[in-house]
A protein has these predicted regions:
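Terminal targeting/low-complexity segments that flank the catalytic cores of oxidoreductases
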Residues: 1-130
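Alpha-helical bundle segments that constitute or directly flank the non-heme di-iron/ferroxidase center
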Residues: 44, 48, 114-145, 208-236
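His/Met- and acidic-residue-enriched segments that coordinate or traffic transition-metal cofactors
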Residues: 80-81, 139, 166, 227
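Charged/polar, solvent-exposed surface patches and flexible loops
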Residues: 83, 87-90, 94, 98, ...
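Acidic/His metal-coordination segments adjacent to aromatic residues that form catalytic metal sites
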Residues: 102-123, 184-219
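Long, hydrophobic, well-ordered secondary-structure blocks that form the structural core
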Residues: 114-115, 121-196
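Short helix/strand-bridging catalytic loops that position acidic/His residues to coordinate divalent metals
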Residues: 156, 236-238
């Protein structure tokens, strides 16, 4: 019995979806990021207005004072959509696991000076709660924002901040056992030096404009906190 295999070229009828083509200037080959992002925002045929906010549709651009002529003019330079984001974070998770394993297997925590360990715990453990606040705020931006190019990265960043909180938790368990987490919580609640940051984080929970919250959390707060803590403190003083 002979089997004759022949290659045949199949020409696609179109290169991408119509709703994507409208944003990239015609029927061109679109990237995965473009197909996962452009035109994905629900705009019509909602079943009902939310009972807790009858003044708005489920997805409503009027929740923000900032209104864009094109909601997809915002673009992620990393081209993250769900698949590329998860693959990138998985590789970073593997690297972090290797770092923790390297430290734990060699007993390097026990070789740290007590002063350095205490300083790290005193400064970093309360920041678990700031990272949790950033997670909440970016989840809110995703829930109430408009335009997938704006809301999808906010959800990725929400989960990134949850990861930061988890890494700080693990660091606390490695350096100081469970009591260090409780000490960090009490410092966040009661220590005078943390109350300004805590007030800012908690006040941001009631900001209803997604763009205002985006600027407050991701530009102002993170823009000051990350260089101060993970640059100035961790790199220069620990």
């Amino acid at each position: 019995m002979n089997i004759d295999l022949q290659a045949r070229e199949i020409t696609p009828l179109r290169n991408t979806y119509d709703h994507v083509a409208r944003h990239i200037g015609g029927d061109k080959v679109a990237s995965r990021y473009q197909e996962a992002t452009y035109g994905a925002q629900p705009m019509v045929n909602f079943h009902y207005r939310p009972t807790w906010d009858p003044g708005h549709e489920l997805f409503d651009a009027s929740r923000s004072k900032i209104v864009l002529a094109d909601w997809y003019v915002l673009k992620d330079p990393r081209q993250f959509y769900y698949a590329t984001w998860t693959m990138t974070r998985a590789k970073q998770q593997d690297a972090m696991e290797a770092n923790f394993q390297f430290v734990e297997q060699r007993g390097m925590v026990g070789k740290m000076p007590d002063g350095v360990r205490e300083k790290a715990l005193t400064v970093l453990m309360p920041l678990r709660h700031a990272a949790w606040g950033a997670n909440m705020n970016n989840a809110s931006i995703c829930a109430y924002g408009y335009g997938t190019a704006f809301t999808a990265p906010a959800m990725f960043h929400a989960m990134d901040n949850l990861g930061v909180a988890q890494y700080l938790t693990r660091l606390g368990l490695v350096l100081g056992e469970p009591q260090s987490l409780e000490d960090g919580k009490q410092a966040w609640l009661d220590a005078p030096e943390w109350q300004g940051l805590r007030r800012l984080v908690e006040d941001s929970f009631v900001v209803s404009d997604p763009f205002e919250l985006f600027v407050a959390q991701n530009f102002a707060l993170d823009g000051l906190l990350y260089p101060l803590i993970y640059g100035g403190f961790v790199d220069d003083h620990v």
